[in-house]
């Protein structure tokens, strides 16, 4: 009688959904009951209280836990897409694991199967293979431990320096901050490039698009910006530091290797994370890499620090997403891109933000790169990203081949919010420059048709040519903001109007060397005050005049 009661108690304790419980678990329960029956004689000799306590101990000591895993089987596999049957409770964008050890991500949740994109070579998977849920949405390691490292789209180290030591992980697909935590852009993000910092200034928390044809210097602007942050990151003021994340999407491995070497030579890798999903990587990894890099940048933003992320380039991410979507049988739209390709980029770029003080005051600045075909900015992806971002730096092939580098088209380039973040000193010297350059371009188009030009027009042309020369800058040689102010001051105030255009670059190099070596106090004053006072203006005028007299002589 006792053994029957014990068995009944054990069965009642088991889950009601008997279908989920393995037969082994039930069998072990009945074996335990039989063992109780065998020792019944011994139990009858003891007292009732002692007997019940022994029963409790034995029942509680029995391990009735069952490890349940939801698994499915591969129905078909090809082109990096697996159709899986049986994962009834899988979540969207959940990581799944194949029996070969490969990982994948569930994207299409259909009534009778799940469409899984494979992170790797699908030749290792065959029909009938078991697929199991991991229960985790795709996440990556984040934290300062990643600085100086090169990782793949899943956050695994690929630089041969051992595993990443970070204990913190973060989902790749987090929602962008709402309206309340944000604040308007107000701090400058200095690129060290004269043409950008003076004409299309960028603020911390801004999204500024770099757009242009191939081989026009888009990546160079991004790399110069990273190198320029060394002057701030070498200091001790955490508020001035800017951590950098460079996401390489669909590039050649040799290109990424050269880039890492360039950053290492400039001593910039120590504050930079490189996320690489090269052309030979699977399309899902190229799709995922920008989101992974963004999560790494958000760690700094949400901890009251400042970060810069460069997506190079989002055109290739859109192509990878188009490939996945078409293979998943999603309906194509314009240029065969799926209908949600706008959302693909908007949900990524909206995560760049300047947070208010109640939320730590951190920022994440985004510099997405888009490659155009023959300068066509009216194509689908370029127009999408232009409408999402807070401005664009437009690079032209024609200017590049004329030797104007960086090849920025000042007329088409704009920064919608950056002027609020521009330093006052730069506003004072560069305020009229954009207008003068615009007038120069307009007049230059007509000047080639006739030679009879009035003095004012000739003056406009003369000034425009010299300002264009002044904005030229070598690759990997970013300048401090106070040095830019000194050089642009000489051009805008007309001191270079009588100098031959061919001598402008030579003058600039000599003048900068002179100012840095002889007038460091003035540069320090401009840097500290953030503006040109009357005394600084008079001093600058004196320095430029005296130097020009000696330079021309």
Swiss-Prot record:
Glycans are attached at residue 76. The record marks 413 as: Required for activity. The N-terminus is blocked. Mg(2+) binds at residues 219, 312. The modification N6-succinyllysine is found at residues 161, 167, 230, 239, 261, 305, 427, 498, 506, 531, 539. Pfam families: ATP-synt_ab, ATP-synt_ab_C, ATP-synt_ab_N. It is found in: Mitochondrion; Mitochondrion inner membrane; Cell membrane. Fetal lung, heart, liver, gut and kidney. Expressed at higher levels in the fetal brain, retina and spinal cord. Signal peptide: none annotated. Belongs to the ATPase alpha/beta chains family. The siderophore enterobactin (Ent) produced by enteric bacteria binds Fe(3+) and helps bacteria scavenge iron ions from the environment. As a consequence, the mammalian siderocalin LCN2 plays an important role in defense against bacterial infections by sequestering iron bound to microbial siderophores. LCN2 can also bind iron bound to endogenous or nutrient-derived iron chelators and plays an important role in cellular iron homeostasis. This is ATP synthase F(1) complex subunit alpha, mitochondrial. The lineage of its organism: Eukaryota, Metazoa, Chordata, Craniata, Vertebrata.
